[in-house]
Design a protein with these regions (language model features):
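Soluble metallo-hydrolase cores and metallopeptidase-like ectodomains found primarily
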Residues: 44-105
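Active-site/substrate-binding loop(s) of hydrolase catalytic cores
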Residues: 96-269, 273-278
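Bacterial N-terminal signal peptides
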Residues: 10-21
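Structural recognition of the beta-strand scaffold that forms the well-ordered cores
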Residues: 64, 81-83, 102-106, 142-145, ...
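Acidic/histidine-rich, surface-exposed loop or edge segments in extracytoplasmic proteins
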Residues: 27-38, 105-107, 209, 427-434
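Bacterial N-terminal signal peptides that target proteins for export
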Residues: 2-11
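Hard-cation-handling environments
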Residues: 252-469
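Catalytic centers of hydrolytic enzymes
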Residues: 427, 432, 437-441, 448-453, ...
Length: 567
């Protein structure tokens, strides 16, 4: 009996010591922003030192360098850091415990959206040596805490190439986005989140889920019903306002394409609200297209240093509550995502007229929900000092004790807005059956290299071969006004042709994880594909045969795997 009591006391003391040790370490290891008392943004060199300390104290953490920024006249290359935090101390995908879901967090693709980065560093600390360490029993974490070191240093949206990283997820011109996709395809997490900041907003945290119709609708429904509902509930307990992420855009303008519109082309006075973009060029749908539970988080922001602490806190709890929700539903998430991924590959092995890929779509109204009521800030004529605890009549004496603090900026009052131009739905307007594969002429090596950047498997013909292919003849084409936009109109006639496929031409089978992405990138009518970027020189003339062919025969081809030794 004495031995049992002694053992219990010993175990309790041991647990307490471990817990106290973790708390002490988390309090000792401060993020760079905490060190400066949130008077400065964390920079790459400071982040490196912070991660070194985390790596030293946390055997569960592995830090890797996954790339470098490009060198410019005023900026030397900076490392891109990647944190793997797992209970098993995994250093590569084969070491992951796949019984748990894996969560990839990408922060601050836009350099001036600083709180996402600061919150990611807090999350790393609390997972590695702090109070969130128990989460590692149920969830694997992959974190890119600063995706745009250049933009962060100069507090600007774009990177050192003057590229908007969150519009580069199709053409992959930046080393930063190439690194993101390499990490995603190497580890294939079930859940991802891309973290940003929006403008000043009543809603401190907004989270959006997948929205492209080529992504299975079950993922969107599960995201909203099972995850976002729980995140909203937990944020509310913290006094943090939440709404699913909404976008305001001028009607007739694609605000998510990455276009730098001329002022005269942005004169539409009518605006609409919708959920986040259907485009595949961002850090959410570009990963969601692999049947991933993919999210975007937008924290409210004035983009000033004075509010950095509170903005970081809002973002942190958004990350934390989403991670806790995933961890609590891990088995269901693993089953859902993996089943959809396997089903997509199996479907792509067989040509079926009813197996459609959606190429063009539009935002649409919902008859059941013709309008939406949201809360907004409206500038107040006089500063708001507080809120009355109890209503008072005009002329009643008022003291400070009669007021509770006003939870919003004093220059704003909260008003309700009824949005009439509300477009919550997405409707496909151009769809085609997915072929078994595509044939790309050797002359379009740039297309092939970009697809390799997406980790799409490509094969090369080892000999000339006569084949029956499906080709598009262009009947009408109206080019876009801007780079990054698809042709305003492109009509095609599909024809079956006999052609000689040349030795050195390329073949891409759709029977792989990127099945839907492949068609979206290569089809001429796609609003998401390579045709929208001038760099690929794919805009045809009327009467032309589009140079990328469809292949729908179940036939053995003289091909071998292709690798680019330039990479």
């Amino acid at each position: 009996m004495f031995y049992r009591k002694s053992l219990k006391i010993f175990l309790c003391l041991s647990f307490c010591l471990v817990f106290i040790s973790l708390i002490a370490q988390s309090e000792t290891i401060k993020t760079p922003a905490e060190e400066s008392k949130y008077t400065q943004y964390s920079q790459n060199e400071e982040i490196a030192r912070f991660l070194s300390r985390i790596d030293n104290y946390s055997p569960e953490t592995t830090i890797q360098i996954i790339g470098k920024t490009k060198e410019t006249k005023n900026y030397k290359p900076k490392d891109l850091y990647f944190c793997i935090i797992t209970e098993e101390a995994a250093g590569c995908p084969s070491e992951l415990n796949r019984e748990k879901p894996t969560f990839l967090l990408i922060a601050s693709q836009h350099g001036n959206e600083q709180s996402a980065k600061e919150a990611a560093l807090l999350l790393i600390r609390d997972l590695a040596v702090g109070e969130l360490k128990p989460l590692l029993k149920r969830l694997n974490f992959l974190i890119i805490p600063q995706a745009n070191p250049y933009g962060s240093q100069f507090d600007q949206r774009r990177n050192e190439q003057d590229l908007d990283l969150n519009r580069d997820h199709v053409k992959l011109e930046s080393p930063e986005v190439k690194a993101i996709h390499r990490i995603f395809r190497t580890w294939m997490p079930e859940v991802t989140m891309d973290a940003h900041e929006k403008g000043e907003s009543y809603y401190k945290v907004s989270v959006g889920c997948v929205s492209n119709p080529n992504i299975h609708p079950t993922l969107q429904k599960f995201s909203r019903d099972a995850i976002l509902a729980e995140v909203e509930k937990n944020l509310k307990k913290k006094g943090i306002t939440f709404q699913e992420y909404l976008v305001t855009q001028q009607i007739g303008i694609d605000s998510s394409a990455g276009v730098r519109y001329r002022p005269e082309d942005q004169r539409s006075e009518e605006e609409m609200k919708r959920f986040s973009t259907t485009d595949l060029n961002d850090g959410r749908n570009s990963l969601g297209i692999y049947e991933t539970l993919s999210f975007i988080q937008e924290g409210a922001s004035r983009h000033d240093i004075q509010t950095l602490r509170e903005r970081t806190e809002w973002q942190y709890f958004g990350f934390r509550f989403l991670a806790e929700s995933i961890a609590g539903q891990g088995e269901k998430i693993n089953s859902l995502v993996r089943e959809l991924r396997e089903r997509l590959i199996e479907k792509a092995k067989v040509y079926a007229e009813q197996d459609l890929v959606h190429l063009r779509m539009k935002y649409a109204r919902d008859e059941k929900e013709p309008e939406i009521v949201i809360k907004n800030f409206e500038r107040s004529e006089i500063p708001i000092r507080g809120v009355l605890k109890v209503d008072k009549k005009a002329g009643d004496f008022l003291t400070r004790d009669d007021l509770v603090s006003y939870p919003y900026p004093s220059q704003y009052k909260v008003v309700e807005e009824t949005v009439k131009n509300w477009f919550p739905n997405v409707e496909a307007i151009v769809s085609v059956p997915r072929p078994l594969g595509y044939i790309i002429p050797a002359s379009h090596q740039d297309v092939v290299e970009t697809m390799l950047g997406h980790d799409i498997k490509i094969e090369i013909f080892t000999q000339d071969r006569p084949l029956e292919i499906e080709a598009y003849q262009i009947s009408t084409v109206v080019p876009a006004k801007y780079d990054y936009l698809p042709p305003q109109r492109i009509d095609v006639e599909k024809k079956k042709l006999q052609t000689i496929v040349k030795r050195g031409d390329f073949y891409i089978s759709c029977a792989q994880a990127s099945a839907n992405l492949i068609s979206c990138l290569l089809e001429p009518q796609s609003q998401y594909g390579f045709i929208r970027y001038l760099k690929f020189n794919l805009i045809p003339e009327e009467g032309d045969i589009f140079p990328i062919f469809r292949f729908a025969e179940k036939k053995e081809l003289p091909v071998i795997p292709y690798k680019s030794w330039k990479r």
